[in-house]
């Protein structure tokens, strides 16, 4: 990797998250914006990435091909769609580039492809790059170990009307954190929908509820409910910049990593707590 700075490329540069990532990359010390990418045929190709993000001229033109910029970046930051991310993953694996993956909605095969690639390149793969959310995940592990076997656990998440996957990747990560703390498999204890005559709640399950409305950036609550009391642990995001800053921070953290699969808790050293 480049000696002086980590050079990042931003996939999906013209999207809501892409523009925030460009701003974060331009602002963070030790990071240089090396490339910005949009899909082939986009009217944004050729435009200045900094101006696109509202951050002023950056001197980096938006491109439609990773091949065209393969010598301009060390780490690709990708918050796009699973099919696009997996194509980018294959390129980065072939050319020895690190990746920060914030894309959600992968199936099991997609997740396995990421694990396989991490044997050769360094990857930070997380459902949520907010510092607060990752502290939340740690708190959920602690709460589950104390209360999980005695309470009804529900996870409620809300996002903007444009989000295409449900439950959110963060909600699933919350479920995984709780299930893992209880030595359970989330696939076997999760309840993703309730409709009609459902009967009484099945003990030991983890319920999920989803809201899609307006411009909600992201809200997540885990509820541990007993008779007479309940604990709710909530995170609310008010700006995508919290995710963008975390993703760029992750790219910087990867600077000296050759290979391996990491998440945001590794970046923040939360696993040592």
Swiss-Prot record:
Record localization: Cytoplasm
Protein residues bound to NAD(+): 12-17, 38, 102-104, 126-129
Keyword presence, Ribosomal protein: no
Chain sites annotated for binding NADP(+): 39
GO BP, sorted A to Z: diaminopimelate biosynthetic process; lysine biosynthetic process via diaminopimelate
Disulphide bridges: none
Active-site residues annotated for this sequence: 159, 163
Enzyme Commission number(s) of this protein: 1.17.1.8
Keyword Lipoprotein: no
Predominant cellular place of this UniProt entry's protein: cytoplasm
Keyword annotations from UniProtKB, A to Z: Amino-acid biosynthesis, Cytoplasm, Diaminopimelate biosynthesis, Lysine biosynthesis, NAD, NADP, Oxidoreductase
Catalyzed chemical reaction(s): (S)-2,3,4,5-tetrahydrodipicolinate + NAD(+) + H2O = (2S,4S)-4-hydroxy-2,3,4,5-tetrahydrodipicolinate + NADH + H(+); (S)-2,3,4,5-tetrahydrodipicolinate + NADP(+) + H2O = (2S,4S)-4-hydroxy-2,3,4,5-tetrahydrodipicolinate + NADPH + H(+)
A GO MF label: oxidoreductase activity, acting on CH or CH2 groups, NAD or NADP as acceptor
Enzyme class of the recorded protein, top EC level: oxidoreductase
Gene Ontology CC annotation, any one: cytosol
Gene3D superfamilies: Dihydrodipicolinate Reductase, domain 2, NAD(P)-binding Rossmann-like Domain
Residues noted as binding (S)-2,3,4,5-tetrahydrodipicolinate in the record, renumbered to the chain: 160, 169-170
Pfam families registered for this protein in UniProt: DapB_C (PF05173), DapB_N (PF01113)
InterPro entries in the cross-refs: DapB_C (IPR022663), DapB_N (IPR000846), DapB_N_CS (IPR022664), DHDPR_bac (IPR023940), NAD(P)-bd_dom_sf (IPR036291)
The protein's role, per its UniProt record: Catalyzes the conversion of 4-hydroxy-tetrahydrodipicolinate (HTPA) to tetrahydrodipicolinate.
Assembly: Homotetramer.
Similarity comment: family membership: Belongs to the DapB family.
Protein name: 4-hydroxy-tetrahydrodipicolinate reductase
Gene: dapB
């Amino acid at each position: 990797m480049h000696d002086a700075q980590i050079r990042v490329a931003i996939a999906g540069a013209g999207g809501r998250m892409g523009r925030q990532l460009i701003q974060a990359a331009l602002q963070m010390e030790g990071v240089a914006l090396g490339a910005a990418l949009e899909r082939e045929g986009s009217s944004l190709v050729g435009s200045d990435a900094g101006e696109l993000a509202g951050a002023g001229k950056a001197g980096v033109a938006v491109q439609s091909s990773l091949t065209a910029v393969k010598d301009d970046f060390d780490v690709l930051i990708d918050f796009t769609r699973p099919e696009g991310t997996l194509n980018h993953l294959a390129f980065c694996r072939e050319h020895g580039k690190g990746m920060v993956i914030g894309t959600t909605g992968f199936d099991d095969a997609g997740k396995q492809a990421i694990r396989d690639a991490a044997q050769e390149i360094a990857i930070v793969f997380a459902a949520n790059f907010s510092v607060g959310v990752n502290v939340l995940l740690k708190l959920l592990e602690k709460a589950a170990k104390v209360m999980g076997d005695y309470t009804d656990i529900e996870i409620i998440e809300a996002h903007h009307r444009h989000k295409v996957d449900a439950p959110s990747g963060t909600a699933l990560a919350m479920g995984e954190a709780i299930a893992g703390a209880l030595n359970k498999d989330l696939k076997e204890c999760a309840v993703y929908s309730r409709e009609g005559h459902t009967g009484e709640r099945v003990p030991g399950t983890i319920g999920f509820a989803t809201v899609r409305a307006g411009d909600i950036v992201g809200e997540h609550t885990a509820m541990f409910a007993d008779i007479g009391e309940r604990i709710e642990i909530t995170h609310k995001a008010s700006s995508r910049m919290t995710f963008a800053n975390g993703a760029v921070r992750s790219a910087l953290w990867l600077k000296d990593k050759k290979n391996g699969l990491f998440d945001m808790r590794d970046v923040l050293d939360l696993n040592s707590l």
